[in-house]
């Protein structure tokens, strides 16, 4: 699982008025995951093992690593950045994971499937 912060810099405005703070190390780790998955795909392809990642936008629910839910201010700030004006439901991200596990995606490897309601296109 990856994040749009692995392909774009963080938008600090989405944290304004919330108790959340941006974490620059998070972007570094997620960007590294993009490259790592491509390198793994280039090696393991010879064994017919496919390696892909999901790059998700914000997901409705709890804050990662916390029992706290996202504040309404964060959801409002975040939603303004997406074409669909909302965060993803967990099952919407899960559908991408399922797709990549199916035979219908058997020729896909080394890819980062972006599921972000258009955030990365802005």
Language model regions located:
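Catalytic loop of short-chain dehydrogenase/reductase
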Residues: 1-32, 37-46, 58-60
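Conserved SDR Rossmann-fold cofactor-binding beta-strand/turn motif
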Residues: 2, 50-60, 101, 114-116
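Generic structural signal for alpha-helix termini and adjacent loop/cap motifs
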Residues: 11, 39, 85, 102-106
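A glycine/serine/threonine-rich, flexible loop-to-helix segment
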Residues: 12-16, 46, 53-82, 122
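Short C-terminal tail/terminal secondary-structure segment
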Residues: 13, 98, 109-122
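Short, small/polar-rich loop/turn modules that mediate ligand/substrate recognition or access, typified
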Residues: 45-50, 108-110
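A conserved structural motif in NAD(P)-dependent oxidoreductases
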Residues: 82-93, 104
